């Protein structure tokens, strides 16, 4: 990517190299990013040398984009922040409030305050105070949902950009991170949940979502589809299937997995499985 500055109305442009990757999802030292999907830019209304950039996270510069420091980090690891994947920044000219649009909704702050990684790592929380304005917005896009077979009202649902959520009959809880995908509620154990994130990363909770562990359902380390399928054989309790390039099966309640197919035939390009179903009563 490139960051360019003009001081003559666009007649000439200067390239700035901030020395960090402000589009990445980490601390700026790692490659990658999603600039074709999430990208936002705002210049301070009273000081043109102060610039804010949004990629996965939010970064700020006080020297006209020569150097950048973090302003918000999506995992909440270093204190309250905003959701990942920034799309647009806007300033209200009368109040000075700044509005941030991202995959999690809409946030407002009176001032975007630049922080530093050293302070964050040393336990000093992000100084910017955010108000989440997303409550009541019916905009979440769900990929998969499962309901309990023995407890009315229990649900688990995976949502684009907004993790996997569990409903215990009275309240919703966010239980697994990432983009929420396929999932499962154990009919024999009200506290056992299985959920997944993009490309077939599966997680299990045995305490109703308060803690979780990674589950390796992919013994051959194959690629999975964006919404990698997970199905249970309810006629044979403890038998599960997942689909990557091939179908994997577990006969011991998800502890061990083995491939049961060898797709594709020679000469045919491999593709990820996008749907699985178990025949009832057979």
Regions found by a protein language model. Name each.
Residues 1-282:
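Beta-propeller blade termini and top-face loops
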């Amino acid at each position: 990517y490139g960051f360019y500055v003009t001081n003559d109305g666009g007649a000439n442009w200067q390239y700035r190299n901030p020395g960090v990757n402000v589009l990445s999802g980490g601390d700026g030292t790692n490659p990658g990013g999603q600039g074709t999907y999430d990208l936002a830019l705002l210049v301070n209304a009273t000081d043109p040398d102060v610039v804010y950039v949004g990629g996965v996270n939010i970064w700020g510069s006080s020297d006209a984009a020569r150097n950048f420091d973090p302003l918000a980090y999506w995992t909440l690891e270093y204190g309250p922040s905003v959701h990942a994947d920034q799309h647009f920044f806007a300033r209200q000219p009368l109040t000075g409030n700044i509005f941030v649009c991202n995959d999690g909704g809409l946030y407002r702050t009176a001032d975007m305050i630049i922080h530093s990684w050293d302070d964050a790592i040393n336990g000093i929380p992000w100084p910017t105070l955010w108000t989440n304005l997303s409550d009541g917005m019916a905009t979440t896009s769900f990929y998969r949902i499962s309901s309990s077979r023995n407890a009315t009202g229990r649900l688990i649902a995976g949502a684009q950009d907004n993790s996997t959520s569990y409903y215990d009959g009275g309240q919703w809880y966010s239980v697994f991170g990432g983009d929420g995908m396929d999932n499962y509620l154990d009919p024999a154990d009200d506290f056992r949940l299985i959920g997944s994130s993009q490309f077939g990363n599966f997680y299990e909770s045995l305490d109703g979502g308060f803690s979780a562990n990674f589950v390796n359902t992919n013994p051959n380390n194959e690629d999975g589809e964006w919404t990698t399928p997970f199905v249970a054989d309810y006629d044979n309790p403890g038998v599960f299937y997942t689909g990557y390039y091939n179908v994997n099966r577990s006969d011991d309640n998800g502890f061990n997995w083995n491939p049961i197919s060898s797709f594709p035939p020679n000469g045919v390009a491999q593709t990820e499985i996008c749907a699985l179903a178990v025949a009832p009563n057979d």
